[in-house]
């Protein structure tokens, strides 16, 4: 359903704010006539997505901040940012590549999370308007957060109809590891309308990667059947989140990597989230082998988003399309190694529709 208030196919740039060292940061508004998307060069963040409910009423369904200052102050939630060089966890922050061991500073207990203490979400990316959207570019130097090789990462956001497409590419001048994803938090009720526990989740995944007590994969690919992690049919998120199941106890809810069915490298369904009340629906497709469903377990109200809303536990959910956590230390997992002359490329699409 087209929303007359939204212009079709427009991209507008404005100044979002200025960093403490004086860098002006742009924000871009993309409109399609159906939804409106805002992205910024700081961390290549997805700032907002306004989408209609079944009656055409618009709401922002992505958690975010009104100003750049909110993102500069938040070093904890990764709210809508592009995380890298290695999204998700690396055990002990250590990995070995071509016989050499590298150390990433730890920032999540004993492990490195989302690229270490200063990940890609904390840099100002170069930006360029392209047909239908924006391309952001970041050059991460050799040794950045302990990772080898100068990595050139590009993230493209393009909007067509009710679908936001995110394309990731990366090249390197030395062998390295890379795992890029977007860490948006979604709430289909609206970003100021309580928690996500009554939304329904469906995951196109028959297996998941169980984790140890520090949320590092054990290396097993376990079936979801018969567990509270079975979302092969739509399930209310909050229905089983408190079950006495060891994997849920470890994470305080859902914070696991599901193995997406189908062939990695091909665009296929990963997840469907629905809100029976508003009628809003989010369909996630990806070329990645996995998707991390995180139910906002560690949000504690210490950050205040748009509308003056404190983001408390389960305020939003993440669907981080990705290679598996700690892949550099698991040779049996799909590889995250990138060599000179190769280009890493992955695509994720987010379709914001309405239930029929």
What is each PLM-predicted segment?
Residues 3-356:
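An exposed, glycine/acidic-rich loop-and-rim segment of catalytic or binding clefts
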